[in-house]
Amino acid sequence: ILFGNIMKKYWFLLLAALLGGATCIFAKDTLATWKAPAGVALNSDFTVKVRLQDGVWHTLSSYLIKVDEVRDTRHYVENASMAIFDFTGKVEVAVTYNLGEVQTAKVRPLSYDIPFQIDGNTVTFTLEHPRNLSVEVNGDIFHNLHLFTGSPERTIPDKDNPEVIYFGPGIHTVKNGELRVPSGKTVYLAGGAVLMGRVLIENVHDVKLLGRGIIDHSIKGGIRIANSRDVYVEGIVATQCATGGSENVTIRNVKSISYYGWGDGMNVFASNNVLFDGVFCRNSDDCTTVYGTRLGFEGGCRNITMQNSTLWADVAHPIFIGIHGNSKAPEVLEDLNYINIDI
């Protein structure tokens, strides 16, 4: 009898485990979208819609994003578009070009080999994995749609936690246009939040900057990490995200788009143990650099990795290493890794 009870319990646990696994495998697909707050610059060149398979279409906010075009050695600021959403499972995307008929289209990076269909002035395609994309119509790369998709946030910080600096949907201003983050704090920008100021992570430790929000496109040098350690940045859109004199820094799924002079995307100066994972850089100077002594930061660099990322340099270089340093006492840049990069 005892043996029989044990076997019944065993089979019950096994069945529960199998059912539990099936529930995970066939979990419901999810979609998260956010409306742009009133007063933020939008672009009507595209209408962007997304839906779960055979579900209801959701129209996304299409933000105005500026990029730098060089023609005949001169710089011209052009107006492009940007839309953002998160999902799991499979989604259909419809991008309608509101300025005319679509003759040709591209969905970049081309390495993803995403099939699409053109019907009149609409391009449609399906996504099964989060991607950071450029949708281009009729060969125009300077008035394109930047479509940034991610996995849903696993945990959202508690806005009532005193260690959290929380910005919900809407436009937010900060004193002197700068948010200085103390040690031990988490800054959270919710989807639909736009911060009108730089985020400065300077001379601190154990800091996080998270969310699906935006540091406004008018803010130069949107994120600055300096002389700090144990810093984690994820999901934010900003013009730039520089790291100097720091160690143990992770920058994941951050999008950097700039349009002005010296608009480097993700510089690294005299820092160690820096990881860029799943980032997107479209910049008006170098997308990512590794330098020694420069701009007040001193020393070499060690263990810098960029992986699973997309680099688009409208000006200068996608990757730039060296050049700046201490010529009188040369420094070492070592263990630099670039893995699975689209350029």
Language-model features: locations:
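Bacterial Sec-dependent N-terminal signal peptides
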Residues: I1-K28, L210
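Beta-strand-enriched, solvent-exposed domains that form extended recognition/catalytic surfaces
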Residues: K28-K159
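N-terminal domain-start segments of secreted/luminal proteins
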Residues: W34, T149-K185, A193
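A structural detector for beta-sheet-dominated domains
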Residues: R51-Q53, D86-T88, T96-N98, Q117, ...
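Extracellular beta-strand-rich solenoid/capping regions of secreted or surface-exposed proteins
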Residues: V123-L127, H172-T186, V194-L210, D216-V231, ...
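Short, recurring structural edge motifs at helix starts
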Residues: H172-N176, K220, G263-M266, G292-G296, ...
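Right-handed parallel beta-helix
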Residues: G184-T186, G191, H205-D216, R229-T239, ...
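Conserved mixed alpha/beta catalytic, RNA-binding, or beta-rich assembly cores of soluble enzyme
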Residues: R198, M266-N267, H317, I323-G325, ...
